[in-house]
Amino acid sequence: MDLKEKIRIIDGFPKEGISFKDITTLIGDGEGLKASIDMFVEYLKDKNVDLIVGPEARGFIFGVPVAYALGAGFVPVRKPGKLPGETISVNYDLEYGSDSLQIHKDSIKKGQRVAIVDDLLATGGTVEGVAKLVEEAGGEVVSLAFLIELIDLKGRDKLGDYDVISLTQYDI
């Protein structure tokens, strides 16, 4: 299945000059959602993944069903103040500033094999921060998997030697 046929493009959102890739049409279509999950699972099934890590919020949409299909656990990555208990944090750069993400300190055990699953690879700043969190917790990042990659933003270049897959690619 061509997943691009299920993703709506909205020009001028959230501001003029942006071509927004709206995944709500894909996740609202049972066939499209199943196909995207199946594609992630097919790619990750031989990587011996212990955990799927997903950044809020759309990483949850794809990460949980992928974890379930692989028999792996799921670790949510949240903005500060959203997780109870002891957390570890990372600051990361955005195009116009910086932000912070957290995971529970005990959510990843030393040596666990982790795939990070998210909806979008743009500049790579968010996933680079998530990968640092995983590694700080003792995990080994074995793959970074995305529904959409905006290739003109060169996020893949920022991610060095990580194994990166995207199910669809768009020019900006």
Swiss-Prot record:
> What does UniProt give as GO cellular component?
cytoplasm
Disulfide linkages recorded for this protein, renumbered to the chain, are none
Matching entries from Pfam families are given as: Pribosyltran (PF00156)
Give the principal location in a single coarse category: cytoplasm
Q: What pathway is this protein a component of?
A: Purine metabolism; AMP biosynthesis via salvage pathway; AMP from adenine: step 1/1
Keywords recorded for this protein, A-Z = Cytoplasm, Glycosyltransferase, Purine salvage, Transferase
Question: Where is this gene product found?
Answer: Cytoplasm
Catalytic function, reaction form: AMP + diphosphate = 5-phospho-alpha-D-ribose 1-diphosphate + adenine
**Does the keyword field hold Metal-binding?**
no
Swiss-Prot/TrEMBL GO biological process terms? adenine salvage; AMP salvage; purine ribonucleoside salvage
Coiled coil regions in record: none
MF-aspect GO terms: adenine binding; adenine phosphoribosyltransferase activity; AMP binding
Q: Can you tell me which family this protein belongs to?
A: Belongs to the purine/pyrimidine phosphoribosyltransferase family.
NCBIfam families recorded: apt, PRK02304.1-2, PRK02304.1-3, PRK02304.1-5
> What task does this protein carry out?
Catalyzes a salvage reaction resulting in the formation of AMP, that is energically less costly than de novo synthesis.
The protein's assembly and partners: Homodimer.
Designated name of the protein: Adenine phosphoribosyltransferase
